[in-house]
Amino acid sequence: MEPRLRVFELARELGVDSKRVLEVLQSLNVDVKNHMSTIDQKTAEKVTDAVRRTEAQEGQGAGKSAAKSAKPAAQPKPTREANPAKTSLLEDFFGSGTRPQRPLSEKRERRPLTERRPLAERRPLAERPLVDRPVTERPLAERPAAELRPGAAKAAAPARPAAEAQPVAERRAPAEAAQAAQAERRPAEKAQPAAAAKAAPPEKAGAAPVPGAVAEQKQAATPAAAEQKPAGKAEQTAGAAQAKPARAEAGTGASSRPASAAPAAQGEKRPAAAAERREEPQAEAPQTSGPSRPVPAGPGQPARPAGSGIGVPVKPAAGGKSGLGLPTRPGEKAADGARGGGSGIGLPVKPAAGQGTAARAGGLGLPQKPKAGAPRPGGGLGAPQRPGRRGAPLAIPKLDPKVAEQAKAGEGKPRYGQSGDKRRADLYDRREHPSSQPSEEKLFGQRPKRKASAQERRVLKPITVTGPMSVKDLAHEMGVTAAEVIKTLLTGFGIMATINQELDVDTCVLVASEFGVEATVEQKEDIIEVYDRVEDPDEPAELKKPRHPVVTIMGHVDHGKTSLLDAIRQAKVAAGEAGGITQHIGAYEVELNGRKITFLDTPGHEAFTAMRARGANVTDIAVLVVAADDSVMPQTVESINHAKAANVPILVAINKIDKPEANPQRVMQDLTQYGLVPEEWGGDTIMVPVSAKQKTNLDLLLENILVLAEVSDLKANPDKPAAGTILEAALDKARGPVATVLVQAGTLNTGDVFVAGTSWGRVRAMFDHRGRKLKSAGPSTPVRVLGFDSVPQAGDVFRVTPDEKTARAIAEKRIAKAQAERLAQKAISLDDFMNQVAQGEIKDLNVIVKADVQGSVEAIRGQLEKLRNEEVKVKVIHAGVGAISESDVMLAVASKAIIIGFNVRPDDRASRAADEHGIDVRTYSVIYDIVDDIEAAMKGMLKPKIEEVILGKAEVRETFKVPKVGMAAGCMVIQGKVTRNARYRLIRDGVVVWDGEINALRRFKDEVREVSEGYECGITLQNFHDFKRGDILEAYELQEIKAG
């Protein structure tokens, strides 16, 4: 949308009241309400032209009266003076490049020049008093401007010593100048647009004359020059020039061009900007007749040509170079030491060396950046002329229809069409006026260059796809916008995606190919998979150091595993176990001859199969304990299978050899059936007969364990972040979640951040198996760790992470993955369950399990899930660690479940809630008791067996019709009895024709409950009336027979 400008902003730039602009708008039939209304570019230009035209007409009479008056004119208002630090808003709006035929920056510089607007109409030139000035009486015929302005050139009388060098006879009268200008006006009009845009060597101009130079110039001025100076100008002093430097009218471009008091030498180089414009092709301006006047710069200095306000070069005449200064506004004083003011569109000229900054040649009428130590002069819009060429200030082209026609026809070149001028002006604006820079979309200006589209900005370089990527990331990698990727997915693949939706690898490759980008698939290892491993397979072997072995005690129930370990480590552990059965993994360290051995005690019965499997995976040597009196049992076989699956060497300890019925040879014979051949029989399995009770051969057992460890060459790298396995986890009311961790690689230190499964945390404290606090733990060391955010799962991999952010991210990803898997499983099982319920094939016994440690929870869950038969199964809907809470009771209420607690008790609130809702809460200390009770409950829930009992039979002897009832059958009970509430089936020729209930059973006219054998009765059936003689009505009922 085209930018718009408010009325009060336009009025402020035009220097008039908003009311006046509103009147002009109303006269132009533009619908505006107040000064806050907005107008477009064309309307603003129309208003600007109308206001200028009106001001010019009003100021024409004022200019003439001011010329006739000998009294010096009043100083212009401060608001009319140029402000070098300000950039016109209209210039921002109508800057270069928006109107090639006439940049609006000219309008900005012409704004305060209201009296001089119709200068082209004021003729003859004799009416202007400014012709009496010494330098302004040049023949105007030499000015190739489109419109010659009478008395257009003014000189700073006292500052210009050129009066001595110029003969009075050469100064033409205004009438002569007008006649000469009339002859050359037409060719000048054609050359003016192109010439105005070209840069000639700039005329030297000082922003503020140095006092010393001003004094020298005053001494060099001739009496004739002083006589020709108007009375109103004679009062100007050098002091005034020092106090107030010559400034340009910023709104109009009129500039008082101070002459250079000490011009540079003839060989001085021009600025780069002027040099660039000199090299550009210039339209030849017509040569003018009449003598040219050199402008001496000072005593002993070579003369420099004077530049015209419009930059139209004039060929120099013989004898020197000449130039013409630009006139100031009527009634305005020129500063001493400065040349007469320029026209409304002139540019200040280049100063001599040491005299300040020259106006940029061919510039945009903006204030120029001063050199060091010199004030900024005002700037105009014209370009300085070439040496020796004269020119006159260009009249406002808006009022000249010929200039407009030339611009429309393309004859003239835009003044600011040169890219160099525009680039230099824009650069100056950015340096000097950062606050006045227009926005990207210039108001009333040309649309900025279109940014390169995503298609153009695309870098067609290969990308690497390491995994699923979101639409946003894929678009960023390819250098396109997300909208393009979404569009391609929809149109090319029919996928409706959002910006954050993840795309799989194959889709990413296909989308990249649609954009012409080569995609390489590189499978990046998932961070979860990295932290799921304990050992690094790529770790160099030279970094590993020897470590002590980890030994697992395995075997059948009550074969003496814990007793043997207790005997080894000299601690009474078995006495603390409920029922003498180990309930969860214990990890202990023993030392023999300075060498350590870590023992893991795993429960032996089949309920702890999963725990035993984990124990086998973390161990180096498996000690299989077999009782000499029981020999091989089912759990013994299972232990052998787990050890072989984990590739763990097995050492057999034949326990209880002190018993009279012990038979070690039988044990060895039975083990050979499972691939364990003793060394005595030529095998490779070490078998040691021991007695845990008598502590027989314990040292021999330990020595053999160390021998196997040496053969296995156990090594680990202790100089890396720790990694291990969670052996056991529990929730301690005082210390929170606590876990037993076996460090398998690296060194675990207090303060390390870790992740284990879906839990993470920081090591707050570590304790060994004796309860001593540790600061670090190396490989093969079991420790109890505090600092988990939640209770981890037994068997989870424990890994130290670089920071908490990484640990939290891994845990959250694992939680999300587990939830997704659980939801998927629930969806499938729910569908199956609903089908089974609809068919009446299955029933569930919902159970909530709470235990003291995670290992017990898993053991109970596994044991209960095995308790099922053809019609009933146990469904564990929740299992956790800790005391039975009120939330567990509420869950049991909602799911109609029973609560089982193992080594835990319900709290007070949970007990009250259970009593209130009638929830069955049972607590146990031995797992086998749980199994027995659940089996009994399942028997009570078995679907009862339905048996059909025949009550009696009746034969249809007669049929008759009963009003309002239908057909009735007159029957004779031939067997048993028939009752009112029994079910009946109608049998005809051995085929059941109908089955259902009867409507009525009558004997004569009375309703009866039953009719015995040998009696007659009348029977009507529900929805059946087609009785026939000989049909048999069989009465029966269904009875439930409970399973024993």
From Swiss-Prot:
GO terms for molecular function: GTP binding; GTPase activity; translation initiation factor activity. Residues 57-77, 147-168, 190-231, 254-265, 352-375, 383-395 have a biased composition (Low complexity). Residues 104-146, 267-281, 399-444 have a biased composition (Basic and acidic residues). Residues 555-562 are annotated as: G1. Residues 580-584 are annotated as: G2. Signal peptide: none annotated. GTP binds at residues 555-562, 601-605, 655-658. Keywords: Cytoplasm, GTP-binding, Initiation factor, Nucleotide-binding, Protein biosynthesis. Residues 546-714 form the tr-type G domain. Residues 655-658 are annotated as: G4. Pfam families: EF-G_D2, GTP_EFTU, IF-2, IF2_N. Residues 55-458 are annotated as: Disordered. Gene3D superfamilies: 1.10.10.2480, P-loop containing nucleotide triphosphate hydrolases (3.40.50.300), Translation factors (2.40.30.10), Translation initiation factor IF- 2, domain 3 (3.40.50.10050). Residues 601-604 are annotated as: G3. PROSITE patterns: G_TR_2 (PS51722), IF2 (PS01176). The keyword Hydrolase does not apply. Residues 691-693 are annotated as: G5. GO terms for cellular component: cytosol. The keyword NADP does not apply. InterPro entries: EF-G-like_DII (IPR053905), IF2_II (IPR044145), IF2_N (IPR006847), P-loop_NTPase (IPR027417), Small_GTP-bd (IPR005225), T_Tr_GTP-bd_dom (IPR000795), TF_IF2_bacterial-like (IPR000178), TIF_IF2 (IPR015760). It is found in: Cytoplasm. One of the essential components for the initiation of protein synthesis. Protects formylmethionyl-tRNA from spontaneous hydrolysis and promotes its binding to the 30S ribosomal subunits. Also involved in the hydrolysis of GTP during the formation of the 70S ribosomal complex. NCBIfam families: IF-2 (TIGR00487), small_GTP (TIGR00231). HAMAP family: IF_2_B. Belongs to the TRAFAC class translation factor GTPase superfamily. Classic translation factor GTPase family. IF-2 subfamily. This is Translation initiation factor IF-2. It comes from Symbiobacterium thermophilum (strain DSM 24528 / JCM 14929 / IAM 14863 / T). The lineage of its organism: Bacteria, Bacillati, Bacillota, Clostridia, Eubacteriales.
